[in-house]
Amino acid sequence: MAAKDIDDTKPDTAADEDASFDMSQAAVKRMIGEAKERGYITIDQLNAVMPPETVSGEQIEDVMSMLSEMGINVVEGEEVEESEGGEVVETGSGSREIAVAGAAGETLDRTDDPVRMYLREMGSVELLSREGEIAIAKRIEAGRNTMIAGLCESPLTFQAITIWRDELLSEEILLRDVIDLEATFGRSLDGDEGLEGMEGIEGPVVEGLDLEAAEGAAPAARRPASDEPEYDADGNPISRIDEEEDDDDSSNMSLAAMEAALKPKVLETLELIARDYAKLAEMQDLRMSATLNEDGTFTVAEEAAYQKLRSEIVLLVNELHLHNNRIEALIDQLYGINRKIMSIDSGMVKLADAARINRREFIDEYRGYELDPTWMDRMSAKPARAWVTLFEKSRHKVEDLRHEMAQVGQYVGVDISEFRRIVNQVQKGEKEARQAKKEMVEANLRLVISIAKKYTNRGLQFLDLIQEGNIGLMKAVDKFEYRRGYKFSTYATWWIRQAITRSIADQARTIRIPVHMIETINKLVRTGRQMLHEIGREPTPEELAEKLQMPLEKVRKVMKIAKEPISLETPIGHEEDSQLGDFIEDKNAILPLDSAIQENLKETTTRVLPSLTPREERVLRMRFGIGMNTDHTLEEVGQQFSVTRERIRQIEAKALRKLKHPSRSRKLPSFLDQ
């Protein structure tokens, strides 16, 4: 009987479970829709929709499997941390961290908050594997090579390189302005080149090295990848954050020493480029002549030799590691000329449209013959009425535009069609490299979040730290070299940290303090904190100077600089009815006592002067500016009285002698002490 009762209860229990699950189907669908938007869901949110006490474990596992197949991650609710500004940073098991918006347990509603939208979109980008990083790095390299190859076909590039070579020889510019010094030197070290040139060069480490110069070749290669803290001899943890600039200054070689080692090799490469391009220019002329004459005189062997020489020049230019600013200048020059050509093309097309020439027909007849001197004669001989109208009504305008195009062709040194092809190749390479860099940056944005949150409460807001870290990330993408073997995240970490710490040093304080002084302040603060624990009180400047082996005057100067500014609106007193600014003396304002003395002196002088003759009184008033806006010179007073300046001087001296008489002067001595 008991067994029968138990059997009777089983269907009811299953029915209850099925009913409970059926009632939650709408909530499950809503949960799946929200999770698809966010890309993840927490265990707590899953339990809120499907409580474990009412839903079986098998059903929960089925739902979790379904979520996994949809690409939705199920994460632990306890791992969600809320950071500054309301952003939530969810830490994963790897070295990177996933940033999401909102707080734990918050409903996943749509939002138009730009910060949350940024974090949501950032979290939707998949992380890159080592193979994915290499693939993108190769795409960046291929795009750059395509761009450089296009630049190497333009005579303007080699004109600029020749100018740079001459300026380097005459020392008008520095080597660091032409090439990427750290990348070139790092490549030389990897190939065991350039070390010979370093022998005998004593280059002091540059203190306060500029960020652009000191952030150098592969910082990750010189630093441990571990984030474990280091300890000093007393067992106290050493703050890496405060000492990063010190490490950079001590590990980076002097820029002058690098330039001295690389300059001979760079000049030699520039000479090779100039020599090879002289040959290439001759072959370009022959190739262009063969194309224009359509006689096929440029043989297959000559074309192969042309392509081989062109590839050699591209390799030489790539070895130089030209500075990005120089490459951008060359590209801007090409694009500027291309805009000029497009403007001329637009003018020609407008004239053709006005003459009712079919646009496609006109472009077919125009393109490729921009520099052909016989083009106008051939086109004007066409029997079509539209072409006749063009040259009857707009011949002078067409001639002017053709003349402008000829000037452009003479300047660029190649045929216009060839120049268009060069520009298209440069644009293609630039676009490919830019797209690959964008993908690399987007895939590592959450790495910036994970690093930036460790630097909060240091004077910059969290979003500002993210922004600065993103700038460092973009620089890391530009300088990353996958052939060195380390992962991009390891390499980018130090660039991001350096960008964030440098921005904190530059922007955190209301009054900017130089980076080298920030380092000294941090060192002083650390020592002061250590001595506070040792002696139980704040150390005196003398004790700090002795501990740091630093001059006392410098310690006092650093302590004075380290003081934070305070607001003039800071409340003063218990009732807080006054502000700090109310107690600051205005150096430009007249004190009430001085104002009273001046007014009394003015009244006394006014009573004394009438005892003189009217002429003497007026001369003194004009000479000393009494009762007037300004004083006057002897010449100006003489012109007023129509007498010489000598006569005015005599009248002034006589009047002053009269004022010294006791009958008049006894009223004035009391003002002499004021």
UniProtKB/Swiss-Prot annotation:
Q: Which Gene3D superfamilies match?
A: RNA Polymerase Primary Sigma Factor, Sigma-70 factor, region 1.1, Winged helix-like DNA-binding domain superfamily/Winged helix DNA-binding domain
Q: Which InterPro entries match?
A: RNA_pol_sigma-70_dom, RNA_pol_sigma70, RNA_pol_sigma70_r1_2, RNA_pol_sigma70_r2, RNA_pol_sigma70_r3, RNA_pol_sigma70_r4, RNA_pol_sigma_70_non-ess, RNA_pol_sigma_70_r1_1
Keywords (alphabetical) are: Cytoplasm, DNA-binding, Sigma factor, Transcription, Transcription regulation
**Pfam families assigned:** Sigma70_ner (PF04546), Sigma70_r1_1 (PF03979), Sigma70_r1_2 (PF00140), Sigma70_r2 (PF04542), Sigma70_r3 (PF04539), Sigma70_r4 (PF04545)
Region: Sigma-70 factor domain-2; residue ranges are 440-510
Record field: transmembrane: none
Inducers of expression: Expression is constant during exponential and early stationary phases, and increases significantly in later stationary phase.
The segment annotated Sigma-70 factor domain-4 runs over 608-661
Q: What residue spans carry the region label Sigma-70 factor domain-3?
A: 519-595
Taxonomically, which superkingdom?
Bacteria
Q: What does the annotation say about its assembly with partners?
A: Interacts transiently with the RNA polymerase catalytic core.
- The identity of this protein, by name, is RNA polymerase sigma factor RpoD
Give the originating organism.
Answer: Rhodobacter capsulatus
Tell me the gene name: rpoD
